[in-house]
Amino acid sequence: MLIMKIKELYIEDRLEDLNIKVPINNNESSLDIHITQGTSFGSNHTTTNLAIKAIMKNINNIDFNSCSLDLGSGSGILSILLSKIGFNSVHSCEIDDFARKESLINLKKNLVQDKVKFVDFPSNLRTKYSLIVSNISGEYLEKNFGYIVSKLMERGIFIISGLNKSKKESFTNLASIENIKILDVLVSGSWMAMIFEK
């Protein structure tokens, strides 16, 4: 679905600018996303591909009149996509200052900088999101799953990518504890993305 070179790496080194095409309207047209050369995560990894597929697969289930959250935004690719598919308000959360700087360059290059606002971890925000997408690995999502779900609106969509397939049972149990539905699981090689609905 995503036209790009895929590397099975966590650390990226984009030696040149990338033009990424995301098919829409049953592949009749595409959204173009431009990512500058750099090292922030989020363009050349299988999990980014899975996250984009998950977003596009659920595009008809999303309330675009509310706000979305890109949690662990890296290069900004998912924030850019969210802006281009219809969100006028996107919160981008990234703790790495260098990644934020690269992301801002990418937001401006894609002309969506006015739609995206950088936020710290939304512990102090009263915002409820119709869509939260997170393409990060490690234990962070497991430890904070309940809190992140609490930031979803009713019928809100939560997309997690960056997961090894071995984590499926753990996140299935977390979904049961939080009483949210698993809509789908997308798999590519050893990686997976899970799609939840509150």
Predicted regions span which residues?
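N-terminal auxiliary segments of SAM/dcSAM-dependent transferases
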Residues: 1-26
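Conserved SAM/SAH cofactor-binding pocket of Class I
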Residues: 39-120
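Residues that mark the start of a beta-strand
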Residues: 31-35, 66-67
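Ser/Thr- (and often Asn-) enriched beta-sheet segments in non-cytosolic proteins
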Residues: 19-21, 32-34, 117, 181-184
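C-terminal lobe and adjacent flexible extensions of AdoMet/dcAdoMet transferase-like proteins
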Residues: 196-198
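Residue-level preference for short coil/turn positions at secondary-structure junctions
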Residues: 16, 28-29, 64, 86, ...
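S-adenosylmethionine
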Residues: 53, 95-194
